[in-house]
Swiss-Prot record:
It comes from Escherichia coli O6:H1 (strain CFT073 / ATCC 700928 / UPEC). Its EC number is 5.4.2.12. One of its GO terms (molecular function) is manganese ion binding. It catalyses: (2R)-2-phosphoglycerate = (2R)-3-phosphoglycerate. The keyword Iron-sulfur does not apply. The keyword Repeat does not apply. This is 2,3-bisphosphoglycerate-independent phosphoglycerate mutase. SUPFAM superfamilies: 2,3-Bisphosphoglycerate-independent phosphoglycerate mutase, substrate-binding domain (SSF64158), Alkaline phosphatase-like (SSF53649).
Length: 514
């Protein structure tokens, strides 16, 4: 019989940042005896999870995709946001052959160029500056029919902040003398990632048929009407923007459709509705043969043009484990399963040799403030069983609660979420110690520690740019190093496991064995 393994466990408490101020801080307000005791009695440090330290622009808040890529890569990975900013600044973007090719083909055939994406300055799934650059590219290349389909944010930005962005684009189109915003809809519909196809269908119909529940002459009028219906940006219902005398912006065969989101997880479903011949999420009322361009690759099995294909990462933590014949488990709920698998593996969809995966279904509720504990009890049960199984050299687990409940902006629910996590951490730490394993507890970015925006007084539903905790639980006598970042975690784990760190990993171990 094989020797029982003593696992190195990484628990990622999604959205669990560190903030000294107590006001509007769900983590401080929650009763967390377990985390308090670990912080007081175990080796610990604070690490950076935002901005330049994770390959984002300076002071840009972190997010789950970026966080997990850096965690798994063991090096700073320059994100699509930063890469695109640079390309636009030096004008390489305006010569991108995939983007220019799609625009030119549509223009030469007298067809429309449709641009869609999350119109947001949040920088998590997209950035409105990139969308503006795409509008300029289409106009510069002589396209006459340019239609922008704006997905509204209110999640990575304040809940009612879309008006200034929409005005900026209205002014741009007026200055160009061509093109217009053709539709607005909340990301709740257009950017679902949990197979809630009834939501996606509403966005698809709006785009393909130019039909929605509402119509307005201007974007601001459409937005104000939504606010009057008590819909924040995220939840704005399908609204056609079309003044009298303006042509219909329904999509037709041969049109170009450029999707300007750079983050994959919430871009996949609506992309599949356009691209997959065998799509069965809902019965499409109109199937259009558009020239579809993904800004980045949303999934390897989506067969359509990609403007910025992924740069491959060699010797990520998962790949290095496989090369060294180690066994590993990835486990999370639906909401963060892609993060501990695809993103942690550097954008690789397939599992590595010796890598098992467990997916726990997230609860089917409209918003997670209705069930702040989410599926954490079942997740913990499965995680504890895996720790005690003796099968795994390493286990990577993500608890989504701090982030998903933090996004609702409901303080009371976020406190409950954090308290549920404290019980989970207790069970996990006990299990790890009972088998002589090691445990690192950290987060990928902040969220729940800031539940109200002090400037506006509105609920703070976005991530933060604050540091996150890192705690060591285990039998090794270790000393914490200050000044770490997410990309130091993989080298830290390898070091604690007594393994060589591959040269591609430029991060440094944050716990030194004394």
């Amino acid at each position: 019989m094989s020797v029982s393994k003593k696992p190195m466990v990484l628990v990622i408490l999604d959205g669990y940042g560190y903030r000294e101020e107590q006001q509007d801080n769900a983590i401080f307000s929650a009763k967390t005896p377990v985390m308090d005791a670990l912080w007081a009695n175990r080796p610990h440090t604070l690490i950076d999870a935002s901005g330049l330290e994770v390959g984002l622009p300076d002071r840009q808040m972190g997010n789950s995709e970026v966080g997990h890529v850096n965690l798994g890569a063991g090096r700073i990975v320059y994100q699509d946001l930063t890469r695109l900013d640079v390309e636009i600044k030096d004008r390489a973007f305006f010569a991108n052959p995939v983007l220019t090719g799609a625009v030119d083909k549509a223009k030469n055939a007298g067809k429309a160029v449709h641009i869609m994406g999350l119109l947001s300055a949040g920088g998590v799934h997209s950035h409105e500056d990139h969308i503006m650059a795409m509008v300029e590219l289409a106009a510069e290349r002589g396209a006459e029919k340019i239609y922008l389909h704006a997905f509204l944010d209110g999640r990575d930005t304040p809940p009612r902040s879309a008006e200034s962005s929409l005005k900026k684009f209205e002014e741009k189109f007026a200055a160009l003398g061509k093109g217009r915003v053709a539709s607005i809809i909340g990301r709740y519909y257009a950017m679902d990632r949990d197979n809630r196809w009834d939501r996606v269908e509403k966005a698809y119909d709006l785009l393909t048929l130019a039909q929605g529940e509402f119509q307005a002459d201007t974007t601001v009028a459409g937005l104000q009407a939504a606010y009057a219906r008590d819909e924040n940006d995220e939840f704005v219902k399908a609204t056609v923007i079309r003044a009298e005398g303006q042509p219909d912006a329904a999509m037709e065969d041969g049109d170009a459709l450029i999707f300007m989101n750079f983050r994959a997880d919430r871009a996949r479903e609506i992309t599949r509705a356009f691209v997959n011949a065998d799509f069965d999420g809902f019965a499409r009322k109109k199937v259009v043969n558009v020239d579809f361009v993904m800004l980045t690759e949303y999934a390897a099995d989506i067969k359509t043009a990609v403007a910025y294909p992924p740069a491959s990462l060699v010797n990520t933590f998962g790949e290095w484990m496989a090369k060294n014949d180690k066994t590993q488990l990835r486990i999370s709920e639906t909401e963060k399963y892609a993060h501990v698998t695809f993103f942690f593996n550097g954008g690789v969809e397939e599992s590595f040799k010796g890598e098992d995966r467990i997916l726990i279904n997230s609860p089917k509720v409209a918003t997670y403030d209705l069930q702040p504990e989410m599926s954490s009890a079942e997740l913990t049960e499965k995680l504890v069983a895996a720790i005690k199984s003796g099968k795994y050299d390493t286990i990577i687990c993500n608890y989504p609660n701090g982030d998903m409940v933090g996004h609702t902006g409901v303080m009371e629910a976020a406190v409950k979420a954090v308290e549920a996590l404290d019980h989970c951490v207790e069970e996990v730490a006990k299990a790890v110690e009972s088998v002589g394993g090691q445990l690192l507890i950290t987060a990928d970015h902040g969220n729940a520690e800031q539940m109200r925006d002090p400037a506006t007084g509105q609920a703070h539903t976005a991530h933060t740019n604050l540091p996150v905790p890192l705690i060591y639980v285990g039998d090794k006598n270790v000393k914490a190093v200050e000044g770490g970042k997410l990309s130091d975690i993989a080298p830290t784990m390898l070091s604690l496991m007594g393994m060589e760190i591959p040269q591609e990993m430029t991060g440094k171990p944050l716990f030194i064995v004394e």
